[in-house]
Amino acid sequence: LAGNLTASFGLDDDNDFFYREACLPLVNAFRQSNNGSDPVRNFVQTDPMTTPLLLTELWVNYQYQTDFNPFHFHGGVYSFAIWMKIPTEWEDQCKLPQFQDIKKDNRKAGTFEFQYTDALGGIRSMSYQLGKSFENCMVFFPASLMHAVHPFYGTDEARVSIAGNLWYDTTGKGRYGNALDPEQLGDKDEYLKTMEANRTEYDGGGNYTKAETEKTFKVKPKKPKKT
């Protein structure tokens, strides 16, 4: 991870439940707003409209005061972040003495910030001024979009967030084929059998239909892949 964070742990999306129920509808919405296209970098030699996506990286972050995640981008096609617990309010962070000589809109304490270039090449940013109203909210964005998590202050509680990356399944073997460490996924034959039973169906128009399978989502404290 790029972050200077206290703790991060990998998660398992059992039966691809979160991927199907949360991620695929957002992928479909993105495609419908972008002429059926994904935000693909030009070095990807695959057809995005016939190559399935997979949630191959999923992890939870525990951020404490002064922890931060500098500007970075992720691998894959799409990324997301979900704020599960936010112990601070941006308005309260703005009142801290070290920020009083800074224009209020430029006070970044406790914010999540995107950075991008506009049509003229200028560097622009968009900040989420986080507080408890953002708990259980999700941002879903192109993996190549630069973003940062700024530090917060004045509390010993952790901010808890979940993040993940969606990649193309270029092997046809699901997460097993894409995994950097396939041994983490257990028995190959059993995994591929389960994947086939839970496979989503592609309709040829940019959408994947959801399979009817048992809906479970478990957390396992394993080391996440680097981004």
What do these predicted ranges mean?
Residues 56-140, 145-150, 156-161, 172:
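Catalytic core of non-heme Fe(II) oxygenases with the double-stranded beta-helix
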